[in-house]
Design a protein with these regions (language model features):
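A short helix-loop-beta-strand connector motif used in the catalytic cores of GNAT acetyltransferases and
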Residues: 35-46, 100
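Conserved acetyl-CoA-binding loop-helix of GNAT-fold acetyltransferases
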Residues: 74, 80-93
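Conserved acetyl-CoA-binding loop of GNAT-fold acetyltransferases
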Residues: 117-124
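Conserved active-site tyrosine of GNAT-family acetyltransferases
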Residues: 114
Length: 132
């Protein structure tokens, strides 16, 4: 199987919802809102196995200095194939002129993945969130 990567936002609401639900992310229950959010994101790189959406990374940026990686996800059927790492490296390359690439890790067990790709834990920072 050959995985193809693209920055074209050519995915449907259903494809996106299926991917997010495959990893049990609640936003997959809101396919239209999720699709709209992705379409309005600074950058989305997706991974495809034929016409099946199997991975995705989403970035928001200020166009000059800082970007934030919001999502990195890969369908469980495709775990262990280096897809997430490839997506992350594509973002690092795209934003190499920026001062900072930040990521909010949803689960601390995933920190080592980012550390393998050169990210450092900021001991003096604490992530916060307001939820409606």
């Amino acid at each position: 199987m050959t995985i193809k990567y693209t920055e074209e936002k050519n995915f449907t609401s259903q494809q996106v919802a299926d991917l997010f639900l495959s990893v049990r992310w609640v936003v997959g229950k809101y396919p239209d809102r999720l699709h709209k959010a992705l379409m309005n994101s600074s950058r989305v790189i997706s991974a495809w196995d034929g016409d099946r959406l199997v991975g995705l990374i989403r970035v928001m940026d200020d166009s000059e200095l800082v970007c934030f990686i919001n999502y990195v996800l890969v369908h469980p059927d495709y775990h262990g194939q280096g897809i997430a790492g490839h997506l992350l490296e594509m973002v690092k390359e795209a934003y190499k002129s920026y001062l900072y690439i930040n990521v909010m890790i949803g689960d601390s067990k995933n920190a080592s993945f980012y550390e393998k790709h050169g990210f450092k834990i900021k001991e003096d920072s604490l992530p916060m969130q307001y939820r409606n």
